[in-house]
Structure formats: C-alpha cells, structure tokens
Design a protein with these regions (language model features):
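Helix-to-coil boundary motifs at intracellular loop junctions of multi-pass secondary transporters
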Residues: 17-22, 53-54, 109-117, 148
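Extracytoplasmic gate region of multi-pass secondary transporters
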Residues: 1-48, 103, 107-108, 138-139
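A membrane-interface helix-boundary motif in multi-pass transporters
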Residues: 58, 141-162
Length: 167
C-alpha cells in the first residue's frame, strides 16, 4: 500500500506542486514532470543491482534501504519553493527513481520466488492489488491534504509514509 501511495500519488501530484509552488504554467510543470519517467527507467536497474549484489537477495533489507533512501529527497522537498525549480525537479526525480526501484522489487523480483510453488502470479497479483489500492487512496488523499494543510504538510505526510515503508 505505502509503495503504491508514494509511487503513483507523488507522481500524480508533482505537476500541481510545481505549478503552485513556483508559479509556472501547468504546461511547463507537465513538461518538467515528463522528464521523470525517462530518468525512472534507471530505477529498475539500480533496484536489481542492490537486490542481487549488495543485499544478496534479501528482499526485506533491500526494501527497507530503498524506503530509507526516499527520505533524503523527500526531506529536501519539504522546503519546496525556497530554492530554484531545478533543484526541486532533481529531488523529485531522485525520489521517483528510488520508488521505481522499490516498485520493481515488489512487483517483479519478489513474486519470482513463488514460482517454485506455482504462485508467482498470485503473489504478483496481490502486490499489484495493494499497490493500486494505495494509488487510489493517495490520488484523492494527497490532494485533500494539500488543499487543507498545504504542500509542506503533504510532503511531511510523504515522509511519514517513507518511514512506514522502512518499517
């Protein structure tokens, strides 16, 4: 759930965050946001290398490390609007790349372990279901939080979700 909330929820709200905090046009913020998926492709590669080489196929350690790493750019994003837009985009791209790595781990690498039991698809389906429940909650929820409390509170909420992901 947390991974889906962070992956899809943050990505969905990035253009609005940039538009509102930097007073740029929606089309410009969408253009900046369009760069991120290209950069995020490296997340799957990085996630696989961490999982196989650094954490030696330990899913829990890889996941905890990845979620801990999301806290670095998220902490910087708390101060969005107080530094140049380029830094914001770099921090957001770093965050979305890390969360893409976690998505690859949870959706692809972990379910493969269940193939020997004939359950890879079942596990993958359960993980996908949880991801999209999180996505649905965050798409509405992050907007509600930002409307009521502002973007700083929303990013602090993202940090709390990152901490939950570490646990």
């Amino acid at each position: 759930l947390v991974q889906g909330m962070l992956k899809d929820g943050v990505s969905s709200w990035v253009p609005t965050l940039i538009t509102e905090k930097y007073d740029v046009s929606a089309s410009f913020s969408l253009l900046l946001s369009a760069i991120m998926p290209i950069i995020n492709l490296s997340g799957a590669w990085i996630g696989t290398k961490l999982y196989e080489k650094v954490f030696r196929l330990n899913e829990a350690a890889t996941s905890a490390f990845g979620f801990a790493m999301t806290l670095i750019p998220l902490t910087g994003i708390v101060f969005v609007g107080k530094y140049p837009i380029a830094i914001c985009v770099i921090l957001l791209a770093l965050f979305t790349t890390i969360i893409a790595a976690m998505n690859h781990l949870l959706m692809t690498l972990i379910p493969v372990h269940f193939a020997k039991f004939g359950r890879a698809s079942t596990v993958g389906g359960i993980f996908n279901c949880c991801t999209y429940i999180g996505s649905a909650i965050s798409t509405y929820g992050f907007g509600a939080v930002s409307e009521k409390f502002g973007w700083t509170a929303t990013v602090v909420f993202w940090i709390i979700l990152g901490v939950i992901g570490v646990a």
